[in-house]
Regions:
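Short, ordered coil/turn segments that flank beta-strands lining enzyme active or ligand-binding pockets
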Residues: 58-59, 160
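Structural microenvironment flanking redox-active thiols in thiol-disulfide oxidoreductases
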Residues: 86-127, 138-144
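N-terminal targeting signals for export/organelle localization
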Residues: 1-52, 191-192
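Short active-site neighborhood of thiol/selenol oxidoreductases, capturing the structured segment around
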Residues: 64-86
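Thiol/disulfide oxidoreductase modules built on the thioredoxin-like
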Residues: 122-131, 136-188
Length: 192
């Protein structure tokens, strides 16, 4: 009896195997492969308000991007386990060092690590990152509010009006001429 049950199960499972797809005829287009986010600038969200999601500020209190309205801000989503994220952190730190001082651009790098905030502080210290605050979003509320297609690293430029200008998917040298050109698209409040 046991053999019969196993044989029936085998036959049933064999009928459930994925069927191979026939090649399309020469006059038919092949199905498009699903593409994930491509590295580079994405302007498809331009003009959307910054999400209201809250995350932790460097002191451990809650904050949202509304706190930065009136000043353009570059928001970077990163994690310690993400090699491209770690690669670009020093250039974000240098950007924060040169731009946060004059109020022309805020730089907010938000860790997506699930561990406690002190581990984010220790990680940044280990990298000798001094000018980026240890913003932390262990529940990934901010990345979730930005949409299901957000990958790490992703940087979002929010204008002084609180609306998205662009997203940059992937790592970038934020001290490069390419980055300077992109960042120039954000005009501080009151500066034409």
């Amino acid at each position: 009896m046991r053999f019969i049950v196993i044989a029936i199960a085998f036959v049933a499972l064999a009928g459930c195997q994925k069927q191979t797809q026939q090649a399309p005829a020469s006059n038919q287009a092949a199905p498009a492969a699903e593409a994930g986010p491509v590295k580079g600038v994405d302007r498809s969200h331009r003009g959307q308000p910054a999400p209201a999601a809250e995350f932790n500020n460097p002191d451990g209190g809650e904050i949202s991007l509304a706190k930065f309205k009136g000043v353009p801000v570059l928001v970077n989503l990163w994690a310690s386990w993400c090699a491209p994220c770690v690669k670009e952190l020093p250039t974000l730190d240098k950007l924060a060092q040169t731009h946060d001082v004059d109020g022309a651009l805020g730089v907010v790098a938000v860790s997506q690590d699930s561990g406690p905030q002190p581990s984010v502080v220790a990680f940044l210290k280990k990298l000798n990152v001094k000018d980026l605050g240890a913003y932390h979003d262990p529940n990934m509320a901010l990345s979730g509010a930005l949409g299901p297609d957000v990958v790490l690293p992703t940087s979002i430029l929010i204008g002084a009006d609180g609306k998205e200008v662009w997203r940059y998917v992937g790592d970038l040298d934020w001290t490069s001429p390419e980055a300077a050109k992109l960042l120039a698209e954000a005009k501080p409040a009151g500066k034409g």
